[in-house]
């Protein structure tokens, strides 16, 4: 690996950012709103309404998973556009910045702008990354940016920035803590001289502590510190039930391929390539070289994240944490393999690879585009029209109608899977029994549920007071209050069966280059 190039924003970097913008524009911003994205969109809307994270909706991710979409919604309201569209545009800009950061890190590693171009275009081939760039919001979009910012800072020995990036990544998605802390500690331990190591360690830890302290202070000021501690720490440490790669090791390609398609090979191979590059760099390590140390540190980070994923891996979205590493590893290996060529041939190979990756990314972006958002919105409003002007909606794990109609959930708790039921029962005053009594008193007109069969505490209420309209096993199940007329129930059922809110749009795999 080579010494870093000058840090100025060069023309190739601008080209990478423009390419990313083009790929995201091809995908569009009018795609369907899925359940997971709706959770963060609803959280963002509540933040824009002035409700602190975890108070509007309790979930397990970090507060930035609420705050970043909230900033988007606020900007949208200022300029007079739709909340969700504004959130998606903001997250697309964050994704463009992530692609640009991947370019910078790979450029520094390899001393080659074309290698950086390979890293950026590789990121654009990952279907899950592109999907949530414009069909979110999702917390892992912000997490990817923070990971790359931290890796860039480690490679430049900018320890304050690295500490800030680590803290922000963790405050977005807690699982990002492990690879970044391990990468930073490895880089710090490889610094020449104890004094420089201790000084850099102090700056790194100090920056992270300051960011964390400011976060805690902010929640204390708005009276939501307990809610923060519950959502960020308590539910994860004491209640969350997770599967890991150990339970599904042989099924990883099957899990990833429907979303990542042919780029599953790059996702897995590129991540492992980071480890190989780190091992090669460590053999003759120049500890005075920030980029060489950065390569070794990044490989250690991949191993740390792999170790975490062995016990906590819920599906293809959790693979997004490997996207930055896979892009860097792919670029690094390709640059290494072309070193035997003369300079002109090497540049040609890297340029052709970048073009092929970009073409594949553009084709994949276009082929997975959909425009179901407006139909979803129309269905939500039509259901409300059928059920009356005073209709209220309760979400149990399915906040799409709340987001699309800009409604408040009557209760803070919406998530009840993977240990959350036990958490609510233990921590909510009166537990689940009191919650059911509250719902009987509120009597929401419409209930949107993710998996009613798994919610034993809810089933008696649904059976006694509600009529099932239908829905999809992969998305929302709809129930309406039994006081509606037969005609209104019939019309509502027709809307549910005809509309896109009952459909979870599959993410088809990407075509090859």
Descriptions of predicted regions:
Residues 22, 120, 147-153, 159-186, ...:
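Membrane-interface alpha helices of multi-pass inner-membrane proteins
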Residues 89-110, 125:
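Transmembrane-helix motifs of polytopic, lipid-linked glycan transferases
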Residues 306-344:
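Hydrophobic/aromatic-rich transmembrane helices and adjacent perimembrane loops
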Residues 147-161, 273-288, 334-337:
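Membrane-interface transmembrane helices that cradle and orient dolichyl/undecaprenyl
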Residues 162, 369-425, 432-456:
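Short periplasmic/luminal acceptor-recognition loop of GT-C membrane glycosyltransferases, typified by
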Residues 29-43, 53-72, 78-85, 223, ...:
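Extracytoplasmic catalytic/substrate-binding loops of multi-pass membrane glycan-assembly enzymes
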């Amino acid at each position: 690996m080579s010494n870093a190039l000058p840090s100025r924003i060069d023309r190739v970097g601008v080209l990478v950012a423009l390419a990313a913008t083009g790929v995201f524009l091809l995908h569009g911003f009018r795609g369907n709103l899925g359940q997971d994205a709706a959770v963060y969109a609803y959280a963002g809307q509540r933040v824009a309404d002035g409700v602190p994270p975890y108070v509007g909706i309790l979930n397990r991710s970090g507060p930035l998973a609420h705050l970043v979409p909230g900033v988007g919604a606020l900007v949208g309201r200022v300029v007079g556009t739709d909340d969700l569209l504004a959130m998606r545009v903001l997250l697309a800009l964050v994704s463009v910045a992530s692609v640009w950061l991947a370019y910078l890190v790979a450029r520094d590693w390899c001393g080659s702008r074309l290698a950086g171009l390979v890293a950026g275009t590789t990121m654009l081939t990952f279907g899950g990354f592109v999907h949530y760039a414009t069909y979110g919001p999702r917390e892992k979009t912000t997490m990817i940016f923070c990971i790359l910012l931290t890796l860039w800072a480690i490679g430049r020995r900018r320890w304050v920035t690295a500490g800030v990036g680590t803290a922000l990544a963790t405050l977005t998605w807690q699982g990002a803590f492990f690879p970044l802390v391990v990468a930073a500690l490895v880089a710090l331990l490889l610094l020449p001289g104890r004094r420089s190591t201790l000084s850099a360690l102090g700056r790194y830890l100090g920056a992270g502590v300051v960011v964390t302290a400011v976060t805690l202070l902010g929640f204390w000021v708005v009276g939501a510190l307990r809610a923060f501690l519950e959502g960020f720490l308590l539910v994860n440490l004491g209640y969350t039930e997770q599967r890991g790669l150990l339970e599904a090791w042989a099924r990883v390609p099957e899990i990833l391929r429907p979303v990542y398609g042919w780029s599953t090979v790059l996702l897995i191979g590129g991540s492992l390539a980071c480890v190989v590059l780190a091992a090669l760099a460590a053999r003759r390590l120049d500890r005075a070289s920030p980029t060489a140390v950065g390569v070794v540190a990044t490989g250690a980070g991949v191993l740390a994240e792999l170790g975490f994923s062995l016990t906590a891996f819920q599906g293809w979205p959790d693979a997004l944490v490997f996207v930055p590493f896979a892009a860097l590893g792919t670029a690094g290996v390709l640059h290494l393999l072309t070193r035997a060529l003369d300079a002109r041939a090497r540049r040609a190979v890297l340029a052709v690879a970048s073009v092929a990756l970009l073409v594949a990314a553009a084709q994949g972006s276009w082929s997975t585009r959909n425009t179901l958002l407006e139909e979803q919105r129309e269905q939500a409003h039509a259901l409300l029209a059928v059920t009356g002007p005073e209709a209220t909606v309760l979400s149990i794990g399915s906040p799409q109608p709340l987001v699309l109609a800009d409604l408040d959930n009557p209760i803070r708790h919406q998530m009840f899977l993977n240990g959350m039921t036990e958490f609510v029962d233990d921590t909510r005053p009166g537990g689940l029994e009191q919650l059911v009594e509250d719902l009987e008193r509120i009597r929401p007109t419409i209930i949107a549920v993710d998996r009613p069969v798994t919610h034993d505490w809810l089933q008696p209420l649904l059976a006694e007071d509600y009529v099932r309209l239908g829905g999809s096993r992969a998305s929302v199940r709809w129930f309406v209050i039994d006081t509606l007329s037969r005609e209104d129930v019939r019309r509502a059922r027709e809307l549910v069966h005809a509309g896109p809110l009952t459909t979870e749009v599959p993410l088809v795999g990407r075509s090859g280059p």
